[in-house]
């Protein structure tokens, strides 16, 4: 990690509350902006908010607030302003002229965190693509800002020099990235098809950012994911084997955390993680039961899944942090839910049991077969490709009496039918 990434910049947060936004939603949104700032290695000095009928077309907030901000920047020696909404190119230009300090908006802040966290080649390419697409219409407006922004929050990824080059260069780079990404995506698609062909069930772990997905991903798969109490800790898809209590193996994918007010363009930029969701046989939806806005977080995830056309995939909901759950917490997911906490050792086994039970009820078909002991190859396949409940050797008939569960479309079904 270089020195630039460890510098803690001092930030003032700026928010504009419009009539359709409730006080509670606005407060949660500003708190989340503070968490995002912390994740990006920033230090929040204070927040400046204003209630308006509509955002000022020129400066987002009113002229008086702009003057107040200018004075605050000098008084608190702030390094940057972070706006809670996406600023238009003209707003950015006007504000940069009025206040001599670096400024970014919520979208840039999220992109910056994406750039900081990405680890795979595809993740890095997609972040650069999203940043360039965001920067292209803002080149003129940001000119003043970029020349004095230096490093720090909002400067990761493509970098200052790329953003200051002409539009043609950026468009060429966007074209190059799209070409490279299409190759990577084709490769991943072939890999996913191969996994499907092998008959392995795929489960996607989704949830609002910071709900505890990476912790549970590690616990359920014994993998070394990036576990930290920071927003967007996971950006690249991670898929690992998870062994259920019966010995049946499935694939579990960890995904980037969802967030409210996330522009659709940002969702599109992270196809790598979200494709895993669309291809899943089952979605595990993790919700932080200790968060005061847990119901809002749940709605956000469900809405984004609908936008991804993944809302018809079977879902098991897990309410996390049950040891810290709110006193008035009420599960909203109906019968298909479980309460868990990573603090309790036994909950990992209970979580796996719940997943296994759900698979049996909703996705697998029960079978009974009596397979001759001489069918060694088939017996081996049964152990690896089905969820076995009973595997008893009948000495009298020299056969194995087997019962369990299997996917209906698996090729092994044809072999099993001979002995059912």
From Swiss-Prot:
Its main location: cytoplasm. It is found in: Cytoplasm. InterPro entries: G_HFLX_dom, GTP-bd, GTP-bd_M, GTPase_HflX, GTPase_HflX_N, GTPase_HflX_N_sf, P-loop_NTPase. Its cofactor is Mg(2+). It holds the Pfam family GTP-bdg_M. Residues 201-363 form the Hflx-type G domain. Belongs to the TRAFAC class OBG-HflX-like GTPase superfamily. HflX GTPase family. It comes from Bacillus subtilis (strain 168). NCBIfam families: GTP_HflX. GTPase that associates with the 50S ribosomal subunit and may have a role during protein synthesis or ribosome biogenesis. Mg(2+) binds at residues 214, 234. Disruption phenotype: No visible phenotype. One of its GO terms (cellular component) is cytoplasm. Keywords: Cytoplasm, GTP-binding, Magnesium, Metal-binding, Nucleotide-binding. The keyword NAD does not apply. This is GTPase HflX. GO terms for molecular function: GTP binding; GTPase activity; metal ion binding; ribosome binding. GTP binds at residues 207-214, 232-236, 254-257, 320-323, 341-343. Monomer. Associates with the 50S ribosomal subunit.
């Amino acid at each position: 990690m270089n020195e630039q990434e460890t510098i803690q910049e001092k930030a003032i947060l700026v928010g504009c509350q419009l009539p359709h936004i409730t006080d509670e939603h606005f407060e949660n949104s500003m708190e989340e902006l503070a968490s995002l700032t912390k994740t990006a290695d920033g230090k929040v000095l204070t927040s400046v908010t204003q209630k308006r009928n509509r955002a000022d077309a020129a400066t987002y907030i009113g002229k008086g607030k702009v003057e107040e901000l200018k004075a605050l920047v000098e008084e608190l020696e702030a390094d940057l302003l972070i706006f809670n909404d996406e600023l238009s190119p003209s707003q950015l230009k006007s504000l940069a002229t009025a206040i001599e300090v670096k400024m970014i908006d919520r979208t840039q802040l999220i992109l910056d965190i994406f750039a900081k966290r990405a680890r795979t080649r595809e993740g890095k390419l997609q972040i650069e693509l999203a940043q360039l697409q965001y920067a292209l219409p803002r080149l003129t407006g940001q000119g003043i800002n970029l020349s004095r922004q230096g490093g720090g929050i909002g400067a990761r990824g493509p970098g200052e020099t790329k953003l200051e080059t002409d539009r043609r260069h950026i468009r060429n780079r966007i074209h190059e990235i799209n070409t490279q990404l299409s190759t990577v995506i084709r490769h991943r698609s072939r890999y996913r098809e191969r996994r499907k062909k092998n008959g392995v069930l795929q489960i996607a772990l989704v949830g609002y950012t910071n709900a505890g997905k990476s912790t549970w991903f590690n616990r359920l798969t014994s993998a070394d994911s990036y576990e930290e109490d920071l927003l967007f800790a996971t950006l690249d898809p991670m898929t690992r084997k998870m062994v259920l209590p019966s010995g049946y193996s499935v694939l579990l994918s960890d995904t980037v955390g969802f967030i409210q007010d996330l522009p659709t363009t940002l969702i599109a930029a992270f196809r790598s993680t979200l494709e895993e969701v669309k291809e899943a046989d089952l979605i595990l939806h993790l919700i932080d039961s200790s968060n005061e806005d847990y119901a809002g977080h749940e709605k956000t995830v469900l809405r984004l899944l609908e936008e991804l056309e993944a809302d018809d995939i079977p879902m098991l909901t897990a309410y996390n942090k049950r040891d810290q759950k709110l006193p008035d917490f009420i599960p909203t997911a109906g019968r298909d839910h479980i309460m868990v906490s990573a603090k309790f050792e036994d909950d990992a086994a209970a979580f796996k049991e719940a997943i296994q039970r759900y698979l049996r009820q909703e996705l697998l078909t029960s079978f009974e077969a009596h397979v001759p002991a001489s069918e060694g190859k088939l017996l081996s396949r049964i152990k690896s490709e089905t969820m076995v409940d009973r595997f008893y050797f009948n000495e009298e008939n020299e056969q194995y009496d087997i019962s369990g569960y299997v996917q209906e479309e698996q090729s092994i079904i044809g072999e099993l039918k001979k002995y059912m």
